[in-house]
Curated annotation (Swiss-Prot):
HAMAP family: Q_tRNA_Tgt (MF_00168). This is Queuine tRNA-ribosyltransferase. GO terms for cellular component: cytosol. It comes from Photorhabdus laumondii subsp. laumondii (strain DSM 15139 / CIP 105565 / TT01). The lineage of its organism: Bacteria, Pseudomonadati, Pseudomonadota, Gammaproteobacteria, Enterobacterales. Keywords: Glycosyltransferase, Metal-binding, Queuosine biosynthesis, Transferase, tRNA processing, Zinc. Residues 245-251, 269-273 are annotated as: RNA binding. NCBIfam families: Q_tRNA_tgt, tgt_general. Belongs to the queuine tRNA-ribosyltransferase family. Homodimer. Within each dimer, one monomer is responsible for RNA recognition and catalysis, while the other monomer binds to the replacement base PreQ1. InterPro entries: ArchSynthase1/Queuine_TRR, TGT, TGT-like_sf, tRNA_ribo_trans-like. Pathway: tRNA modification; tRNA-queuosine biosynthesis. Its cofactor is Zn(2+). It is an enzyme of class 2 (transferase).
Amino acid sequence: MKFELQTTDGQARRGRLIFERGVVETPAFMPVGTYGTVKGMTPEEVKETGAQILLGNTFHLWLRPGQEIMKLHGDLHGFMQWHGPILTDSGGFQVFSLGAMRKIKEEGVHFRNPINGTPVFLSPEKSMEIQYDLGSDIVMIFDECTPYPADWDYAKRSMEMSLRWAARSRKRFDELQNKNALFGIIQGSIYEDLRDISVKGLVEIGFDGYAVGGLAVGEPKEDMHRILEHVCPQIPQDKPRYLMGVGKPEDLVEGVRRGIDMFDCVMPTRNARNGHLFVTHGVIKIRNAKHKEDTSPLDEQCDCYTCRNYSRAYLHHLDRCNEILGARLNTIHNLRYYQRLMAKIRQAIEEGNLEQFVEDFYQRIGKPVPALSI
């Protein structure tokens, strides 16, 4: 992987990630394909929304179908028939989500398989091996996603262990002679001094990109913004920056304003299945009775397959009848909305008028522009 930084506007960056499997224009949004599928979508449909890179889930694909079945197809690309780049998370967040089912120790994490209850062990080394078999274009180190709230002492212990796990991840990745990219993950909760130690430690180990982890886990937005403003300037300029698990359209805008290049989130797909649809002026809840007789498209400005062909009334009807097609059409629209948003952000950075774009964006959705302290 090669990262080209083309231009900046304030802290915002316009660049490209270049892989053998294709180019990703940044800032980029990555749809989430947890089980080797973006729910309800074919790879061709996902590509048509404008997505250039997907996120796959190491933890879930390891438990089912497993590494051996993946290897029968070559790797995850061959298995799911997505021929662009894939980033895989390391399993750290899923382990964090298991709560009482897991036991975190220095060597790794012991937990019960949520599918059948059998004991399982995941370590930094094992995560690197699974991601190698998946053929991930971007591999994430294995870390502990520090929960929120966490006091300073717990956050410090967690961050320090994540640093040791980062070094072990790097070592195993290199032993496997993996030619793809490996990203470090910055932890430290909402504490700037802990984030400083984490960034410094990761940069010393050396990675192809750096992710900001442990945000969007329940902390106030002001804390997320403050941490991004503090951390991003410390990340080497020539490396891509990835904000994990974020987020709402406003979160993407705010991340870009603070120097983030990459995002992923289940929000567009999950919200689509629940009838929450993103449009130019905010959010439409298609379940509401007011859409029952509305012959207009979801969004006059959207060029997606759904908006070109179907009315709000039809989408309301599909939702009320619990039809699978409704979830699919909603997902196509929401993913296209996110890709259109990123394309407009990239254009605004190129033209040097991102702050004007930000002002217009918030005006349309009826919210104030968050303060920028950087």
